Amino acid sequence: LKKIKKKLPKDKALIGFAGSPWTLLTYMINKGSPKKNTKFLKNLKKKEVIKIIKRLEHLIYIHCKEQILAGADIIQLFDSWAGLIEKKNLKEFCINPNKNIVSKIKKNFPNNPIICFPKGINKNINNFIKEVKPHGISIDYDINLKKLNLNNDVVFQGGMNPKFLLGNNKRMFNEAKKYLNFFKNKPYIFNLGHGILP
């Protein structure tokens, strides 16, 4: 990061990132991506999960802190597997851990914005924003735009399904316009709702 920062133009921001506690935990337990194997979810013991998540919170904050000290202007927290969490556990496994990390970064680095990406929480996105209070929120392509609460101070980012990059140009531009038109009166960073497909 220090080397990149030195070569980066002054008007360009450097974004650091980290996985959120739940997402790191899924990789640890599953020994890899849970994309095709979610059997591990059946054997989770809530008390043990919370204990590990609390430990990860601390380590992730340190990781983010070191990135900021090395030159990162912004931090993005990726909770890529938040969509696997049952609603009854969402607050303890996703909302509270992200909130704790965001709050600590805000307190110690008030000039460094934080973006959160709780992928897959869909109907619970408004509550996540209200509770966690990030500066920015990345949304995935399954979010119902009409149900988003736009009456808050958060900057929205993303949304477009990457599959449209593989289709014809007309559909791709129409999909892009859908997001640009929806957020036209709101601070918005156009982006995909997840990674680029191969």
Question: What would you call each of these model-derived segments?
Answer:
Residues 2-198:
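Active-site loop segments of alpha/beta catalytic cores
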